[in-house]
Amino acid sequence: MSKATLQRRPLVKKILGGADDDLLVIAGLGSSNWDITEAGDRPLNMPLWGAMGAPVSMGLGLALAQPAKRVLVITGDADLMMSLGSLATVATQQPENLAIVVLDNEKFGETGNQASHTSPRNNGPTDSGAGADLAMIAKGCGIADVGTVRDASEVPELVKAARTTKGPVFRLVKVIVEKLEFVMPPQDGAHLKDRFRQALLGRP
Amino acid sequence: MNAETSADWRDEIFEVLQTHDIKQVYHVPDAGHSRLIEHCQRSNSIRVVPLTTEEEGIALAAGAWLGGQRSALLMQSSGVGNTINMMGLTKTLRFPFLTLITMRGEWGEFNSWQFPMGQGTPKVLEAMGVLVYSVDKASEVKATVDAAARAAFNGGQSVAVLLRQKLIGIKDFGKKTSK
């Protein structure tokens, strides 16, 4: 299997490029949160600081409530691994406006880069996982439009899948392990929720 | 009151959910909720989402609220333990949350495996800052669920209604052969 080449920050910036009021974004805790914030903090971003395992379900609830808006969930491999069943729940509802992009660095990145379950097997004493394939899992859960992105040439299709392709869409993106600056949005959850609702609904 | 002519409490819960404009209902199925789930599934105004684990329901409820919709989570007491960390989301985001919980492991329970979480359920909910309402009389179900929905959606609280085993009835699998 080829090594990952993509860097998460420029990639997320491309995915979110030209985001307007029709794009609602939920990011998982840790790196994905800092990634979308570096691309530009906005009221219609819901960056999570905790609640590991929540983003896909939260995205589904939002997508069902707002069928005319595009809902994009951006999260990491370990976050999704905690809530694999949520993929099957998404598939029961088949939301046409929901896209899920998983940035897979094969690590628990926030806690010292321990190998996650998506790391290869037999990869040395500190870097071995299960070789778990989240795209295959998503497919097996009943999400038909699934893909894995490893190379810069595939990024334009990824952006399209995230932003406009009829959902539910799932893309696994293999990204390199990097030490990056923390770029933090507001932390107060009630504030994040209120500003999101104010921007979307005109009331907190 | 004549049981034949009075409204069934499960039908009354459905009415209350409609009155309060609940648009999404999540559940891990339970026998005690089955009639209510079927009502919701037949309704044109409620989206029913089956879950793989109860904690999904908390995150779904948060997403629905972000999008301007009210929701309710139906689960059994054994599922409450699965939600503990995620239940913190209701406090962190401060969004209205309503859950209706059918109790096991108390009144006349036959299955010893149901007792630990059944007995722990009220304490766990209270520990996570969820208001706990409890009802064991059919005649009080409608008013209790209505009050809980008001506290949640008007008062901005996280509220659980415990539908006690005394209300639901003792689960009985009939004659069984033990081996």
Task: Label the model's feature ranges.
Chain B
Residues M1-K179:
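Thiamine diphosphate
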